[in-house]
């Protein structure tokens, strides 16, 4: 077959392939049980965990709002802390007041933590003993939380009139310890199916990059500001009186240097002028190597994950086309192959059967009853049988999609499965005098191959779809097993089969 005719088959496959995200953005609710909290085994499993008096549940919506509010304060601290450390020799009154207010909120959170139960990592049970809560907190993050909340600037005023001692400024940087809350927040959001994973991941990468740029620019400016000769600094070489310029000009200049260095643009207009700046530049560029590798690795993983199914799809379709051309298969068979591959990839993306397989049998039975009970009950073969028999039947059935012009059962084959047409269209074909003729068209809700399955003889017709069809399938072994368990229903089925085929 000419290559041009084979290439014309590609448009019939690609439109039905959707590689979009089907995860987080389609869910409006999440599991209604708290993270990491599992009930114990045995008779006590039904007993809900009881909180002691004055304790605050970590899953209380009000506590969640409090944690979200603290995240906003952490973002503020992450921005203002390096800025104060580098640019503000004499801390203005406004940031000083705001910092004390923010420290007050985190001091309240420290006290509140002594009244918040925690989940034990070994038993996965909620520990609500106040003594155990206190011991755990005192032996873990308590010291760091206190150090990040102490108002070191106010303490420095006792030793220095303006409070710009460099040692106390270093201690004030301990407020960056609060960033661990942001890391925990991103880890929690990445597991939340209500949010798109790729968006959360990209937001995290952008946040890390912006914070690194901000800190590097502030530190580099601090080195220039503390250098004895201002003109022999990276900023003093182009702005001799940079200390007299406004805060905004100096901050933008520092961020400009940081970004051009991080991106290895290196225009050369701002560069190190002394040994201190050279040493910091070396350290910053070495850090940039790690940061760039981290960013590229994460972005590559996101892109590869989103395009891997498309790549696999193209490879399989190309292999099928080459196989058909190499073996000179008829165009009809090649179309069936490509349509089947296209449909298989689309249904694999839906992951319907995989979703059902991971569920308990009782839950699968409820879902099957809701979806297929009335369809199976309406088939002529099962008229008059008990509801229990129909329920057993639909539980064992599997829903499949068949592409147009795909053969379900071939004439003279002994079918091993019974099929039920749910939706779509199927032609019943018969070979007469060497030609294929349409005997009739099967209606929705009609059984296919029941005579061959129940009578164990070759099928008299070929069943071929004419458009995309949804079909229920059950194996002959499972069907006969259910009939043997329900002998009265088996007699009804035998009677229905004889009446139709008399």
UniProtKB/Swiss-Prot annotation:
InterPro entries listed in its UniProt record: cNMP-bd_dom (IPR000595), cNMP-bd_dom_sf (IPR018490), Ion_trans_dom (IPR005821), K_chnl_volt-dep_EAG/ELK/ERG (IPR003938), KAT/AKT (IPR045319), RmlC-like_jellyroll (IPR014710)
Primary residence: membrane
CDD domains: CAP_ED
Record's keyword terms, sorted: Ion channel, Ion transport, Membrane, Potassium, Potassium channel, Potassium transport, Transmembrane, Transmembrane helix, Transport, Voltage-gated channel
TM segment ranges: 68-88, 96-116, 139-159, 170-190, 205-225, 277-297
Domains as described in the record: The segment S4 is probably the voltage-sensor and is characterized by a series of positively charged amino acids. The pore-forming region H5 is enclosed by the transmembrane segments S5 and S6 in the Shaker-type (1P/6TM) and contains the GYGD signature motif which seems to be involved in potassium selectivity.
Protein name: Potassium channel KAT3
Organism encoding this protein: Oryza sativa subsp. japonica (Rice)
Organismal lineage: Eukaryota, Viridiplantae, Streptophyta, Embryophyta, Tracheophyta
């Amino acid at each position: 077959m000419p290559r041009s005719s084979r290439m014309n088959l590609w448009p019939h496959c690609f439109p039905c392939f959707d590689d979009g995200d089907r995860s987080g953005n389609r869910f409006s609710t999440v599991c209604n049980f708290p993270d990491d909290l599992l009930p114990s085994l045995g008779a006590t499993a039904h007993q809900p965990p009881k909180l002691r008096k004055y304790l605050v549940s970590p899953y209380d919506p009000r506590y969640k709002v409090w944690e979200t509010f603290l995240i906003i304060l952490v973002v503020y601290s992450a921005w203002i802390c390096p800025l104060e450390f580098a640019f503000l020799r004499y801390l203005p009154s406004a940031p000083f007041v705001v910092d004390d207010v923010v420290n007050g909120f985190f001091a309240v959170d420290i006290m509140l933590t002594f009244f918040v139960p925690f989940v034990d990592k070994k038993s996965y049970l909620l520990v609500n003993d106040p003594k155990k809560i206190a011991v755990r907190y005192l032996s873990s993050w308590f010291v760091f939380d206190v150090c990040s909340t102490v108002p070191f600037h106010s303490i420095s005023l006792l030793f220095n009139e303006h409070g710009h001692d460099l040692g106390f400024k270093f201690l004030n940087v301990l407020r960056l310890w609060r960033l661990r809350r942001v890391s925990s927040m991103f880890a929690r959001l990445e597991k939340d199916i209500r949010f798109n994973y790729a968006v959360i991941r990209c937001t995290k990468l952008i946040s890390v990059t912006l914070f690194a740029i901000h800190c590097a620019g502030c530190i580099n400016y601090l080195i220039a500001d503390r250098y004895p000769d201002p003109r022999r600094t990276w900023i003093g070489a182009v702005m001799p009186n940079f200390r007299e310029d406004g805060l905004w000009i100096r901050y933008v200049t520092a961020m400009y240097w940081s970004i051009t260095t991080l991106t290895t643009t290196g225009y050369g207009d701002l560069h190190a002028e002394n040994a201190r700046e050279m040493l910091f530049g070396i350290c910053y560029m070495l850090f940039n190597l790690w940061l760039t590798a981290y960013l590229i690795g994460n972005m590559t993983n996101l892109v590869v994950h989103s395009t891997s199914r498309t790549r696999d799809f193209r490879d399989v379709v190309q292999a099928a086309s080459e196989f058909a051309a190499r073996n000179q298969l008829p165009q009809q068979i090649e179309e069936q192959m490509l349509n089947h591959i296209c449909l298989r990839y689309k249904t694999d993306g839906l992951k319907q059967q995989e979703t059902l397989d991971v569920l308990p049998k009782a839950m699968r039975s409820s879902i099957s009853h809701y979806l297929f009970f009335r369809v199976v009950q309406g088939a002529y073969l099962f008229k008059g049988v008990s509801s229990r028999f129909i329920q057993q039947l639909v539980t064992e059935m599997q829903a499949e999609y068949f592409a147009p012009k795909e053969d379900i059962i071939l004439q003279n084959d002994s079918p091993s499965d019974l099929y039920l047409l749910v939706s779509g269209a199927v032609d019943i074909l018969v070979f007469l005098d060497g030609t294929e003729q349409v005997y009739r068209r099967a209606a929705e809700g009609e059984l296919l191959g029941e005579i061959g399955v129940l009578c164990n003889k070759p099928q008299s017709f070929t069943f071929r779809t004419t458009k995309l069809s949804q079909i229920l399938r059950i194996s002959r072994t499972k069907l006969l097993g259910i009939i043997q368990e329900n002998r009265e229903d088996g007699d009804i089925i035998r009677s229905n089969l004889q009446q139709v085929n008399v």
